[in-house]
Amino acid sequence: MKRHFNPTLVLFGVMGSLLLIDLLLPIANLLLHAHWSKWAADLAQPQALAALKISIYASTIAMCIMTLLGVPLGYLLARVNLPAKRLWISLVFLPMVVPDLAGGILLLQTFGPYGMVGNTLGTANIELTNNLVGIVLSQLFVASPFVVVSALAAFASVDTKLEQAAATLGDSRWRMFWRISLPLAWPGIAAGITLAWIRALGEFGATLIMAYNPHSLPVYMWVKFESDGLTGSLPAAFCLVMLAAAAVAISMLLSRLTGYADVVTRLGPQEKAA
């Protein structure tokens, strides 16, 4: 069948291509000018390896906490008519738009040595800054909204009639959550968890304020940029980009293996013409 020229689609294609260039050109430029052997040697240095381990460890801990706490919150916001529900949803979105450095200052004011929580725990010799806990707290603040918002949208997309039918058969809310709501919403939730882990891994601003030491990989990259300039910071930047790409690839692969590829590749199966 002959395709007709559609100026609207051409215009949209040009506009979209400009955005893709802005998104992909920096990554392509990084790969084209890569010094593989030198970067590998730089990343094999003890300080770089320590920063990488800390970032992966902290972001994984943060991801587990975000999943454990964020998924139930998303379910509540999707299914329960809470008082001031719109306000709670807006508050969940807030850390996504607050500048990272401002978020770090807020965290330090609360959890720092002279903060409301930090001062209280300090009497028991419990410190929440300049350690792994401080890094995790920073990552939770900036990345947890991705899990909550994704869970909220995923649970809201589940047909409530399925839960109502299960309720008429005597299923409890707890049983309906595990047998109906969570399995159907999981593809969207998993996508949010992946994005949250990537966001936590690359968190810089709040971590810089809350836990400059021990260096996470983004903070280490900044230290190298200050001491050695752009050339010195490129290996860490490359490592972060590759980790993010690997996380996205693994997420897509798992979606395909579990039969959820349609969620991220198309709107849904198309009906065949009769």
Predicted regions and their residues:
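Membrane-helix/interface signature in polytopic inner-membrane proteins
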Residues: L152-Q164, R173
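Hydrophobic positions on the alpha-helical face of helix-turn-helix-like DNA-binding modules
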Residues: A165-A166, M176, I180, M221
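Glycine/proline-centered hinge or cleavage motifs at structural transition points of membrane proteins
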Residues: L169-G170, P183
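Membrane-water interface segments at the C-terminal ends of transmembrane alpha-helices
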Residues: R3-S37, P46-A156, I180, L184-A200, ...
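Short, Lys/Arg-enriched, Gly/Pro-containing loop segments at transmembrane-helix junctions
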Residues: T258-G268
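Short hydrophobic, aromatic-rich alpha-helical segments embedded in or entering the lipid bilayer
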Residues: Y212-E226
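Short coil/turn motifs that cap or connect alpha-helices
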Residues: P83, S172-R173
